[in-house]
Amino acid sequence: MVAMLAAGCAPARAAGPRNITLTLVRHAQSTANASGLIDTSTPGPELTPKGWCQATLAATQLAPNRYDGIYASSMIRTQETATPTAQALGEPVIVLPGLREIEAGQYEGTPEANIPQTYFAAPRRWLQGDRSARIPGSVDGNEFDARFDEAVQYIYDSGNQNPVAFSHSAAIMLWVLMNVRNPDPSLLTSKPLPNVGHVVLTGNPSEGWTLTEWDADPPPC
């Protein structure tokens, strides 16, 4: 149940700021995760059998929250992860390209074990206020933030009160820590989001967001 959306077709913005609860979920294990190599290509790798197990079990935990909108990035692994939850709730999965992973640039295909010294070198500067820092061959902090902001604005303007969006570890962690009122940058390294880990925010795009939950528990399966 994947509904593709054309760019520039966002619904009209609801009048006045209202607060919503936004849940961001990292995808389940992909074949790239299993290989230990960074893969930020689109549409990218699919889930492993273990990843499908994680997605199915995650749905049993997520579906009782009765989300009124389900979103995923343009990468296959998020759409597959969202599918069991969407089926349980009888909702379509709406694809928003802005939720995709931060492109790794020159670090594409390199070991995930080296991420703190490579892929995350520039993003750590984003969290220190230097959003002009650029991942070599990829985006800077302003470009990434604007892209993810646009996706979140679409979700907000859709009128959902309790939406869930399936995205990616770096994209979720960095956007959250760059945008909430109560950031804790140490979470990037002390509690990185595992497969099907999630965060919960309350607020709205115009007045800001508050981080209320950061679930870094080990994934099922």
Locate the predicted segments by residue.
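Short, solvent-exposed aromatic-acidic interface loops
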Residues: 212-221
